[in-house]
């Protein structure tokens, strides 16, 4: 009787263990916090990223995903950062890469790296076409582990790099995609022009005006970052970026909407692939605020097991 009970228990317990070995995924609920950014901010509101950094540090992420193009995505690099691509490839041809030293340094903890290591890694990541990690190690080379005392007025210098240092991150994970950048910009611009005749241009103008008025008070109190991540603000940016404010659709507005959705779908695919592959439970994505609504919706369909969090969520 005891032997039968043991056999039954083994039959129940073994399949999950085998599954875990086959997939490589630990049985842990994974989550993603998405923080929307303002990109570069005016000097008058230079400290706007402070509340976002405080919020992100409190979350204590284990992996940081950023709005930069993956090094393997040559088409996006050509479309969006051609100068970086040309510089990277020219340096690679002229100098090559010391892969042995690079791999040795990747084994070390962030606190173990020396200033000359930061310089080497910045140069190496540049030659590898990795702008995200080039920017990170260039920041470390310039300001050290203590970081910049002065606000740099952008998400890299005031949010991403300080956050990465605080958790001891040695690598950022880029997930952006710009394969159809030119087509999207043309469609969006033509939609705006067509809106002057249909009256939709006034709708967009009203959305922008409402945003300008509502951001004044938060900006004065150093809370522009928090305002940007309110649900109402994110929804406005979503409507404008995807041309969903349009009441009389045309070929250009339809194209802009589709291209915007497709870009965010590809970003979501990149995120899903990396989050499933990595062992971390708590992940954070730092990306332009206009993407937040799109990505939350798409990820909810693509990766329903992933728990998605926003700053605006009720505690």
Where are the model-predicted features located?
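Bacterial Sec-dependent N-terminal signal peptides
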Residues: 1-28
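Residue-level detector of alpha-helical hydrophobic segments embedded in or interacting with membranes
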Residues: 10-11, 56, 299
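Single-residue recognition of alpha-helix boundary sites
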Residues: 14-15, 48, 78, 299
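Intrinsically disordered or highly flexible coil/loop and linker segments, enriched in small
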Residues: 15, 169-172, 280
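A cross-kingdom marker for long, charged
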Residues: 242-315
């Amino acid at each position: 009787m005891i032997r039968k009970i043991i056999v039954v228990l083994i039959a129940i317990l073994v399949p999950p263990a085998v599954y875990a070995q086959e997939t490589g995924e630990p049985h842990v609920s994974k989550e993603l916090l998405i923080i929307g950014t303002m990109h570069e901010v005016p000097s008058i509101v230079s400290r706007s990223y402070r509340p976002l950094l405080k919020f992100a540090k409190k979350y204590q992420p284990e992996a940081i995903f950023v709005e930069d193009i993956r090094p393997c995505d040559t088409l996006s690099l050509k479309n969006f950062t051609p100068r970086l691509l040309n510089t990277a490839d020219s340096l690679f041809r002229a100098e090559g890469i010391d892969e042995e030293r690079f791999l040795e340094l990747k084994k070390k903890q962030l606190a173990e790296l020396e200033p000359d290591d930061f310089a080497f890694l910045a140069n190496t990541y540049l030659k590898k076409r990795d702008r995200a990690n080039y920017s990170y190690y260039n920041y470390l080379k310039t300001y050290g582990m203590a970081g910049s005392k002065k606000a740099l007025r952008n998400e890299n210098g005031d949010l991403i790099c300080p956050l990465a240092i605080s958790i001891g991150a040695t690598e950022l994970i880029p997930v952006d995609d710009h394969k159809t950048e030119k087509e999207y910009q043309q469609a969006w611009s033509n939609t705006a022009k067509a809106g002057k005749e249909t009256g939709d241009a006034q709708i967009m103008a009203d959305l922008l005006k409402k945003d300008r008025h509502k951001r004044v008070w938060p900006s004065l109190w150093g809370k522009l970052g928090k305002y940007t991540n309110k649900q109402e603000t994110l929804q406005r940016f979503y409507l404008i970026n995807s041309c969903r404010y349009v009441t009389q659709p045309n070929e250009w507005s339809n194209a802009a909407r589709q291209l915007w959705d497709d870009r965010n779908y590809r970003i979501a695919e990149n995120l899903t692939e990396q989050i499933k592959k990595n062992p971390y439970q708590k992940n954070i994505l730092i990306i332009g605020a206009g993407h937040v609504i799109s990505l939350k919706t798409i990820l909810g369909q693509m990766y329903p097991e992933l728990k998605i969090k926003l700053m605006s969520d009720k505690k």
